[in-house]
Amino acid sequence: MAFQKENFIKFILMVFALSSLFFLFLIFAFILIEGLPLFLKVGLKNIIFGFKWAPTKGSFGIFPMIVSSFLVTFGALVVGGPMGLSCAVYLSEYSGKKMKMLLKPALELLAGIPSVVYGFLGVIYIVPLVRNYLGGSGFSLIATSIILGVMILPTIISISFDALMSVPKSFREGSLAMGATKWQTIYKVVIPSAKSGIMAGFILGMGRAIGETMAVIMIAGNALKIPTSILDPLRTLTGNIALELAYATGDHRLGLFSTGVVLLVIIMILNYMANFGIKKKRLK
Amino acid sequence: MNQMTEKLYILFLFIGIFTVSCGRETSDRKDNQSPITIAGSTSVMPFTEKLAEYFMLDNPDYVIDVQGGGSTAGVQACINRTVDIGMSSRRLKDDEKSLRDITICNDGIAIVVHPGNPLNNLTIDQIRGIFNGRIKNWKELGWIDRKIDAVSREEGSGTRGSFEDLIMNKMEIDDGIMVQDSNGSVKEVVATDPYAMGYISLGLVDERVRGLSVDGVAPTTENIKDGSYKIERPFLFLINGTPDENTQSFIDFVLSKEGQIILKKEGLIDIL
């Protein structure tokens, strides 16, 4: 009796576990079915390396958006990377229990704030700041990078923190016993040993930044051109889909799905890289 | 003990599922009226909502469901018969002519700037130049040496479509122009950025943004009505085939004097 129930529960749990895989498969299939026909019709090169996006007039080039997506992602890393890593190092190496108890929930809260709130704050505060002190319209690469940098902090911190914590204590003790100071130990021993995990955190942060939509639409300005300065507006892949989907029909709609395919491939590569990093760490 | 709690959980789960599914069935059926569904242009939507509110006040047993989605989506939904009425803020294209369009009112498109902007008038050619990327600096229009932060709408938008038809004259809107995805967002950008310029529905112009005269004609309801302000477009209701009784009575209400007065109060141009 008990055994049967055990099995029954196991089966139910397995069904739910597999359903997540099933949804992933559905999403893949759906995006590919909708997105691929246009690649066949217009040509891969004309979409990925095309400079002109005028879907109602038959141009589907999304190269500027690919570049813009990577630019904001890189910008977010420049803003959020050092901050996140410092926070993780502080948390794992220096902070006492009390500080940890304060910082950890705060970070979880930061992760839970909806992106539209970030976007709203960006429009109200960051954009005017950029406009008044740096110039341009304020809807810009730099404003977007700052907001995204803050948004990816929780991801970077929590994964880097785990990586730093998993460095064995004996490494630190060995280094200290050799006469190294605490900072030398962190800099020369702990961070290098946790390198692949920290990289994984950065890459997952990149994935979050490249996939962010709502906040980006609100502060990026969404101009189609490749930005030539950090004060220029830009449009990301996700922004393009969300901006135009409501009105799109026919080929225009397919074009947006093609944008989705490209985005999916980029995210897949990033996740693969992150997993690779984590695995390498475990093998060590 | 453990088994008891487990059983309780399962019981609660079933009760939960049961009540939810029951709730669905009963709550949607207030009466025998099926709701009138309307979808389409986000420019027309707020006004349709207002009209629906007034209509339901007088006829409490009608249910009107108004959704956005954009002009093109409205046309599509109407062709597929997923809605009773489609809304569009642009004229129908040739392949969409199977639908019947009813002009419920006209709307001007105002070229708006920040209230602190000293300019009052632009020519159509200047506006075209700005959005075409030929004129980039306010200095060229006789103001300070500062880049113009022009804001357009996204591809497929009815307002953008009308703007292209009425102003751009087959010229393309430049890639460097910013894009926002609703009248509201464009207005927000223009209201907060002193160097911005955009175009929005005239009905939405208030003290936070200022509408510019075009070729010397101010964007007012009177000037649109007598035809001197040229940048105007119709707000359309679209129907596929013969509408049912409920739908027809709502359309009649919108076209009646009462409905038109409501639209006029909202800053639109009535068709009386």
Feature map (PLM): residue ranges:
Chain B
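Bacterial N-terminal signal peptides that target proteins for export
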Residues: 2-10
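Bacterial N-terminal signal peptides
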Residues: 9-19
